[in-house]
């Protein structure tokens, strides 16, 4: 039987308030704090900060 993965599925939500989000994985051991990544928001049509949120 396969071992449970250390990588956790997360959701990166736009700080612009457009409702756009990306899904990705992150290693819980190496980065226990919340991620903040600058990515392109196609709704706002500019680069902005995306913050980590749990996938429901």
Curated annotation (Swiss-Prot):
CC terms in the record's Gene Ontology section: cytosolic large ribosomal subunit
Cited Pfam families: Ribosomal_L33 (PF00471)
Keywords attached to this entry: Ribonucleoprotein, Ribosomal protein
GO molecular function: structural constituent of ribosome
Top-level taxon of origin: Bacteria
Protein's GO biological process: translation
Similarity field: Belongs to the bacterial ribosomal protein bL33 family.
Family annotation (HAMAP family): Ribosomal_bL33
This protein's name: Large ribosomal subunit protein bL33
Source species: Dichelobacter nodosus (strain VCS1703A)
Gene it is expressed from: rpmG
């Amino acid at each position: 039987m396969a071992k449970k993965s250390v990588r956790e599925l997360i959701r990166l939500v736009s700080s612009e308030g457009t409702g756009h989000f990306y899904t990705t994985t992150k290693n819980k051991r190496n980065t226990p704090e919340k991620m903040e990544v600058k990515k392109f928001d196609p709704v706002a049509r500019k680069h902005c900060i995306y913050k980590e949120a749990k996938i429901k």
